[in-house]
Amino acid sequence: MAPRNILIVSNPQDEHTHAVVAHLHKMGVEPILFHPERMGSDHTLSLFQSADPEPDRLILTIHDRKVPLQEMDAIWYRRPRLVTFESNSLSTEALEFARDEWKAFFESAWVLMDGCFWVSRPDRLRLAARKPLQLQVARQVGLSIPRTRITNDPQEAREFYDLCNGRVIVKATGSGWVYSADQEQVHFVLTNRLRQEDLGADEEIRIAPVTFQEEVPKRFEVRANIVGQQVLAIQIPSQQSAISSVDWRRYDVENTPYTAI
């Protein structure tokens, strides 16, 4: 039997969420849609813990509806955004403190809900977004990986550029999402070819770790999602377009049609 108590943790602008919710409605399932960015306005979250042997209780309030989260069968964690605050009276320091408190609370709450079926657990998603760990897992399962150097040392970057004869790409070490201070604007750091003139930007390189990789010529891309034991994969002919040749996420769908494999 399909799970009946489903919580979807997302953001209001996510079109994938809306499509899945509509499909669940057709199945006779009424999921609970939760946008964490609304905390502090008409959403609240409370955790009840005590010395008694009874299990912890997590109560989510959306508008005036109270939802016992321990009764959830399944949770879909789909790109929620950070909490935003309607009050303009908070200082920058106070806002940062409040966001850190929410982050600590949410991370703890999700771990406490380990009895649910997750797609996917936030702690696993965070690890999966880290390039060094991605490469380690790829190597462990037998995949070939390109030569990689992650550093904030400008000299190391220059040496790696020479080692790869100038065939180097640069990418984010983490997820690559960049949010504006008010959370209204979202940008994404894509993969780019490293130019020799970029290596003179010592101050910029020192600010944060950068992932440098040897560029490997490719015929096409494979995008795969695994749900349970099922692998859903598509082939993307990214090399058919100059727009998507370095990073397929510079979409040119008209000239690079996707096919299932």
Language model segments and positions:
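Cofactor-binding loop segments of dinucleotide-utilizing enzymes, especially the Rossmann-like FAD-
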Residues: S10-N11, P36, Q229, I236
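Phosphate-binding site of ATP-dependent enzymes
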Residues: L24, A157, D162-A260
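General beta-strand structural signal in soluble alpha/beta enzymes
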Residues: L33-F34, W118-S120, R147-T151, V170, ...
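Short acidic/polar capping segments at secondary-structure boundaries
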Residues: L82, D123-R126, I150-E156, G174-G176, ...
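Conserved N-proximal alpha/beta basic substrate-recognition cap immediately N-terminal to
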Residues: P3, N11-H23, M27, I32-S144, ...
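Short, basic, helix/turn surface patches
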Residues: D56-L69, R149-I150, I169-Q183
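Conserved hydrophobic helix-helix packing surfaces used for dimerization/oligomerization
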Residues: N5-L7, V168
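Rossmann-like NAD(P)H-binding beta-loop-alpha module
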Residues: V141, P146-N165
